[in-house]
């Protein structure tokens, strides 16, 4: 069996030539559109990379600023209130109103630390302790001395005291 000779029939020759030309034209069209889309994608990726780089720079700048502000705020924190707690008032059978009166008296003695910054109060904490401990307090006509058991310095100054009879 023999393959028919297509070169003798001009209709078939035109058909195959048209197929070849169409294939070449469609291949060039495909390359053009694919290249165009790839250029757009590459430019979009480059823009996004630049945008991400800018955003990362902004984030690092904001983080640095935030860190600096936090450091400044830590330095500038102020004592806003004072709380005093008497730990062993029950041992000496001191009534609740007398405990409250004693705590208020100690608060009045150390109230000058309110609105001072925490750092300066921390530096003078020994003076603050001695101020409380060196004073003799009168409760129900009995003399008591206070001993500072705990001194917590933050925006609230917390003092925990124990008392004993004054000698």
UniProtKB/Swiss-Prot annotation:
UniProt main location, coarse: membrane
Membrane topology: Single-pass membrane protein
Residue ranges of the TM segments: 15-35
Record carries keyword Ribosomal protein: no
Cysteine disulfide links: none
Role noted for this protein: Involved in sporulation.
Name this protein carries in UniProt: Sporulation membrane protein YtrI
Organism: Bacillus subtilis (strain 168)
Highest classification ranks of the organism: Bacteria, Bacillati, Bacillota, Bacilli, Bacillales
């Amino acid at each position: 069996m023999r393959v028919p000779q297509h070169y003798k029939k001009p209709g078939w020759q035109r058909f195959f030539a048209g197929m070849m030309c169409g294939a070449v034209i469609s291949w060039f069209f495909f390359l053009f559109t694919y290249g165009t889309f790839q250029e757009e994608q590459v430019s979009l990726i480059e823009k996004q990379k630049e945008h991400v780089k800018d955003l990362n720079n902004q984030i690092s700048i904001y983080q640095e600023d935030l860190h600096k502000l936090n450091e400044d705020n830590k330095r500038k924190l102020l004592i806003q209130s004072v709380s005093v707690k008497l730990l062993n008032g029950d041992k000496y059978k001191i009534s609740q109103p007398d405990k409250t009166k004693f705590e208020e008296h100690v608060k009045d003695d150390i109230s000058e630390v309110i609105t001072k910054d925490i750092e300066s109060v921390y530096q003078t904490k020994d003076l603050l302790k001695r101020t409380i401990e060196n004073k003799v307090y009168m409760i129900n006509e009995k003399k008591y001395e206070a001993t500072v058991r705990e001194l917590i310095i933050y925006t609230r100054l917390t003092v925990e005291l124990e008392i004993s009879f004054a000698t």
